[in-house]
Amino acid sequence: MCYSANGNTFLIVDNTQKRIPEEKKPDFVRENVGDLDGVIFVELVDGKYFMDYYNRDGSMAAFCGNGARAFSQYLIDRGWIKEKEFTFLSRAGEIKVIVDDSIWVRMPGVSEKKEMKVDGYEGYFVVVGVPHFVMEVKGIDELDVEKLGRDLRYKTGANVDFYEVLPDRLKVRTYERGVERETKACGTGVTSVFVVYRDKTGAKEVKIQVPGGTLFLKEENGEIFLRGDVKRCSEE
């Protein structure tokens, strides 16, 4: 079944019966991902739902923020979860979800943040489940994200996020590692940007414009929550 979280697209596969063994997952992903950004396997571990995320190239990732929102919506749509607050497991730890008029996902904590300079480009290396290189820019709409993002991605070993500060919001574009292209949205990417912006300005919530729409982030009691649009894009 296909889900889109602000244009970040995923194939979600019910693997609670272990029909697809671990060693077969990379091949399954490459053969079935099509033009989507990634594949999420729904697993059961000690009676709890586990989100097993793979990038479109078949590589495993510890976490995916928009994937977590899509995963949560999938569990709700299947009728497996009915509570307004619940948790599920991921390789980045236990993830908390709050459901009101939309889905808020508690993002993994920041395990690393440091200044980094690469080929004259200054930014921050931030890890929120997965690594990101975050850089502030001007004229983000004219930026060649495919070229510069690809160059920085291989030199930093991280996803690459460019952001511009606008009067009422931030604008973000991300080149994703493992997808190897710019995506319409990246949950851990906008979270990494929020962390950098928060530490610079003290902001506790922010609206972020991405190519796939608008995402919202807020910090409460030291925890960062993400929400945005999620919709089903196929019944398959």
From Swiss-Prot:
Optimum pH is 7.5-8.0. Coiled coil: none annotated. The active site is at C64 (proton donor), C186 (proton acceptor). It is found in: Cytoplasm. Its EC number is 5.1.1.7. InterPro entries: DAP_epimerase_AS, DAP_epimerase_DapF. Catalyzes the stereoinversion of LL-2,6-diaminopimelate (L,L-DAP) to meso-diaminopimelate (meso-DAP), a precursor of L-lysine and an essential component of the bacterial peptidoglycan. Also catalyzes the racemization of certain amino acids, including Lys, with low efficiency. Substrate binds at N8, N55, G65, N66, N159, E176, R177, G187, T188. Its main location: cytoplasm. The keyword ATP-binding does not apply. Optimum temperature is 90 degrees Celsius. The keyword Ion transport does not apply. Probably forms homotrimers. This is Diaminopimelate epimerase. GO terms for cellular component: cytosol. Keywords: Amino-acid biosynthesis, Cytoplasm, Isomerase, Lysine biosynthesis. It catalyses: (2S,6S)-2,6-diaminopimelate = meso-2,6-diaminopimelate. It is an enzyme of class 5 (isomerase). GO terms for biological process: lysine biosynthetic process via diaminopimelate. It comes from Thermotoga maritima (strain ATCC 43589 / DSM 3109 / JCM 10099 / NBRC 100826 / MSB8). Pathway: Amino-acid biosynthesis; L-lysine biosynthesis via DAP pathway; DL-2,6-diaminopimelate from LL-2,6-diaminopimelate: step 1/1. Belongs to the diaminopimelate epimerase family.
